[in-house]
């Protein structure tokens, strides 16, 4: 857990478009970015670079970038929703749960397990320990 980033695209949100008849909710795609520094770790006893390791049960508390879609996502009906870590490294376990790594699949702008945008961890939070399994 550190200064890593998860990117999800497209995060399709309903955006009011002004027309002469009044605002019309229109689905528009936005990029969705989640910082791993805002993730609540599920494994506090496994440290990498003096920071708790992130596993598949960790919860990203905030993802942003879709604030213009003020009516929320077409699937989750949220904006700035949570990030769920969907697929991790099954050969390396952190507290018995698959570890998250660079290129791990995420679901972003989520309501429980219902993601509005598919995503992936594209910027590592540390480069001391590489999870290649």
Spans of model-derived segments:
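Intrinsically disordered, low-complexity proline/glycine-rich segments
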Residues: 1-133
């Amino acid at each position: 857990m550190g200064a890593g980033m998860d990117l999800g695209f497209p995060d399709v949100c309903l955006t009011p478009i002004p027309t002469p008849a009044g605002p019309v909710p229109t689905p528009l795609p936005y990029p969705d970015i989640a910082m791993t520094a805002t993730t609540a770790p599920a494994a506090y006893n496994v440290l990498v670079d003096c920071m708790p390791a992130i596993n598949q049960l960790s919860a990203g508390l905030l993802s942003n970038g879709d604030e213009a879609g003020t009516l929320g996502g077409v699937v989750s009906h949220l904006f700035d929703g949570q990030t769920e870590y969907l697929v991790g490294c099954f050969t390396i376990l952190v507290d018995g749960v698959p570890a998250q790594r660079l290129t791990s699949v995420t679901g972003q702008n989520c309501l429980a397990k219902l993601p509005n945008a598919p995503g992936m961890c594209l910027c590592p939070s540390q480069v001391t320990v590489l999870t290649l399994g």
